[in-house]
Amino acid sequence: MLKIKALFSKKKPDQADLSQESKKPFKGKTRSSGTNNKDVSQITSSPKKSFQDKNIVQYPSVVADDHHMKSLTDELVTTIDSDSSPSDNITTENVETVTSVPAIDVHESSEGQLSSDPLISDESLSEQSEIISDIQDDSTDDDNMEDEIPEKSFLEQKELIGYKLINKIGEGAFSKVFRAIPAKNSSNEFLTKNYKAVAIKVIKKADLSSINGDHRKKDKGKDSTKTSSRDQVLKEVALHKTVSAGCSQIVAFIDFQETDSYYYIIQELLTGGEIFGEIVRLTYFSEDLSRHVIKQLALAVKHMHSLGVVHRDIKPENLLFEPIEFTRSIKPKLRKSDDPQTKADEGIFTPGVGGGGIGIVKLADFGLSKQIFSKNTKTPCGTVGYTAPEVVKDEHYSMKVDMWGIGCVLYTMLCGFPPFYDEKIDTLTEKISRGEYTFLKPWWDEISAGAKNAVAKLLELEPSKRYDIDQFLDDPWLNTFDCLPKEGESSQKKAGTSERRHPHKKQFQLFQRDSSLLFSPAAVAMRDAFDIGNAVKRTEEDRMGTRGGLGSLAEDEELEDSYSGAQGDEQLEQNMFQLTLDTSTILQRRKKVQENDVGPTIPISATIRE
């Protein structure tokens, strides 16, 4: 059993400390649908827009040449796993719908469209206009991207059609993720016009066949009807294609290719990276920035639920974002629990645009998603720590599971650490089953009653009493902004709290982020607090023969990655650092670990789904 040691100072030992982090900005992290990433140069993969419910760019979900998917999805109709319950299946009707989704006309939304939100002041609109202008000016930086030279020759390039692999940006247990650009000779004008760069997840068939063969050996003598790895890949592709069509808060599905040796899943490339990394960098989010992120997540979930699809693995690692220009605060607002020497400035927040460098936010990773329609589903999945009580207790559950996940993400953004934590997995799952969390002092002392109420409604133990997606979107707290002048308050007072920077285009690389921050001991421990527990839980389910359905393949992979090359428990314990809820920073703790020469930190487990 993997363990994470914890020390707690004067506070309940319920929560992992992710407050008071040293804030070194990091370089262009890029991620596609969940993966470990290497530094890549900042690029623009899609037009950047202000975020609004109505005036939002509708990213194209399907390229014009749909012949790659046609034969595969036709075949999928007859290859859906027979062992799944009716709720597991993607019906013939739905698969046909997937293949016929038209490409979205990106010209329907103009480049300079501004927010029509009545909550936004004239000053905010003016600033929003300036930011959009800056973004448009910067877009020319990518004009010569097709001339980029790959950093090396990749074996995966040989069978890939229409794209040029530039560099590897991530790697999972059975896949690699590449940044790529459309080939110069591509006949697909829609693709080359609307996507300067893409992310391609490459899955090697031989690796999947090997892991499925191992499972068959384990299940020998049992009535096993596990679907083939190919079926599982096609299911994930079909669901991703379905849910991303027409929703700008979901990472766009672009293309899919199958060759003799590989599966290629081509999808939108977001240059900001994971929201998880921003929580680590900023320690926590202001209520305004938390609203900005969580509302976009809620809109993505609303779209999925309207299609009868439940995500089942909502967490900060599965939220990606497009960066915006950072505007420094003249007098950063600090909480009493903050250390002014280490708390990073979140900067000015602009309603409808964002803040802290975070603009448009999108939901990724559909490896555990399931189409349930109006029926309940009973396949335990997700990440322990963000998993709803009814899932932990192996009860029937439906779309309210995603609302629990939204609540955990909101809690984490507001204070910097998750609502449920314990060094022992069995204790953690018991806490989740009982809904045992607290608004821990002093971190929650200055968070508004409205925010606490929203979290409480989302983390309601009884699913029937828990917010549904429409109730959450109507919550009063979600539909206000602290940065806007209150009634009778001068707008000049608010405008004077920050100063805007107008950097040269080449300085529009935002924060020059330091990727090492994401591999610091505290960040690793935060991920492992959820991912390791989830992997252990799924291992137990696998022994009982209860796993299956759409998420099976993803579960195999995450389990493999979480153990980081099958290190022994003893070695893992030596590499882990001690969590503490004091004011020490991530980098200070990391320095102590290095000075003690306890060995390298555990690599962050890959969250990409294969």
From Swiss-Prot:
GO terms for molecular function: ATP binding; calmodulin binding; protein kinase activity; protein serine kinase activity; protein serine/threonine kinase activity. The modification Phosphoserine is found at S46, S50, S187, S520. This is Serine/threonine-protein kinase RCK2. Activated by Ser-520 phosphorylation by HOG1. The lineage of its organism: Eukaryota, Fungi, Dikarya, Ascomycota, Saccharomycotina. It comes from Saccharomyces cerevisiae (strain ATCC 204508 / S288c). Residues 31-55 have a biased composition (Polar residues). ATP binds at I169, G170, E171, G172, A173, F174, S175, K176, V177, K201. It holds the Pfam family Pkinase. It catalyses: L-seryl-[protein] + ATP = O-phospho-L-seryl-[protein] + ADP + H(+); L-threonyl-[protein] + ATP = O-phospho-L-threonyl-[protein] + ADP + H(+).
